[in-house]
């Protein structure tokens, strides 16, 4: 809570001429709003993910393949990585984003409406519980331990080496 100091990542662009008051939907041109230079991993969550050809495939100096093989394998690696990644994102990105959204919304709801109130309630009740526990300890457990200690203090063991 409090004053927001960070800029929002989401912006809404609306031109007066493209805004229509009729009931039909007027879709904007997506190319107009997509910035190809945008950093999609600003917090470097996937900085350890190495997908460059040189990071995955390397030949030592003593065992080089033919130059044409190296060039073709590099090209095939990059093309297959690009095509398969695009293919997988087309079919998996939206359902996984939807599932992750549901999961995070559920966890947020549970955290906000169940876990935090439960913890706050426990923290409110703990001083009373602490007082009751101290009284139970002083009335019941302390006398039992004291009497057991006195009983066992009179026991003596003598060992003989015969």
Curated annotation (Swiss-Prot):
Belongs to the caveolin family. One of its GO terms (biological process) is caveola assembly. Transmembrane segments: none annotated. The modification Phosphoserine is found at residues 20, 23. It is a peripheral membrane protein. Residues 1-86, 108-162 are cytoplasmic. Residues 87-107 dip into the membrane without crossing it. Its main location: nucleus. One of its GO terms (molecular function) is protein homodimerization activity. It comes from Sus scrofa. It holds the Pfam family Caveolin. Keywords: Cell membrane, Cytoplasm, Golgi apparatus, Membrane, Nucleus, Phosphoprotein. It is found in: Nucleus; Cytoplasm; Golgi apparatus membrane; Cell membrane. The keyword Phosphoprotein applies. The modification Phosphotyrosine is found at residues 19, 27. Monomer or homodimer. Interacts with CAV1; the interaction forms a stable heterooligomeric complex that is required for targeting to lipid rafts and for caveolae formation. Tyrosine phosphorylated forms do not form heterooligomers with the Tyr-19-phosphorylated form existing as a monomer or dimer, and the Tyr-27-form as a monomer only. Interacts (tyrosine phosphorylated form) with the SH2 domain-containing proteins, RASA1, NCK1 and SRC. Interacts (tyrosine phosphorylated form) with INSR, the interaction (Tyr-27-phosphorylated form) is increased on insulin stimulation. One of its GO terms (cellular component) is plasma membrane raft. This is Caveolin-2. Phosphorylated on serine and tyrosine residues. CAV1 promotes phosphorylation on Ser-23 which then targets the complex to the plasma membrane, lipid rafts and caveolae. Phosphorylation on both Tyr-19 and Tyr-27 is required for insulin-induced 'Ser-727' phosphorylation of STAT3 and its activation. Phosphorylation on Tyr-19 is required for insulin-induced phosphorylation of MAPK1 and DNA binding of STAT3. Tyrosine phosphorylation is induced by both EGF and insulin. It comes from the Eukaryota. May act as a scaffolding protein within caveolar membranes. Interacts directly with G-protein alpha subunits and can functionally regulate their activity. Acts as an accessory protein in conjunction with CAV1 in targeting to lipid rafts and driving caveolae formation. Positive regulator of cellular mitogenesis of the MAPK signaling pathway. Required for the insulin-stimulated nuclear translocation and activation of MAPK1 and STAT3, and the subsequent regulation of cell cycle progression.
